[in-house]
């Protein structure tokens, strides 16, 4: 019974700590929007080079 107050205090302290990322952000971490921008840019380059739509094969014919 003597350990119960200590346990409760520890739980309250743990719950009140600020949440932080478990791992530091690295150079490889990219946002999802960045991937979408890269994909759009690559598709645009492919379309410009071939004069053909990459997504819609009907315009190539």
UniProtKB/Swiss-Prot annotation:
Residue ranges the record assigns to the propeptide: 23-48
MF term (GO), any: toxin activity
Posttranslational mods: Contains 2 disulfide bonds that can be either 'C1-C3, C2-C4' or 'C1-C4, C2-C3', since these disulfide connectivities have been observed for conotoxins with cysteine framework V (for examples, see AC P0DQQ7 and AC P81755).
Location of the protein in the cell: Secreted
Chain positions with Cysteine amide modification: 60
Main location: secreted
Tissue specificity remark: Expressed by the venom duct.
Pfam families (alphabetical): Chi-conotoxin (PF16981)
Gene Ontology terms: cellular component: extracellular region
Signal peptide span: 1-22
Keywords (A to Z) from UniProt: Amidation, Cleavage on pair of basic residues, Disulfide bond, Secreted, Signal, Toxin
Family, similarity comment: Belongs to the conotoxin T superfamily.
Entry's free-text remark on domains: The cysteine framework is V (CC-CC).
Protein name as it appears in the record: Conotoxin Tx-D021
UniProt source species: Conus textile (Cloth-of-gold cone)
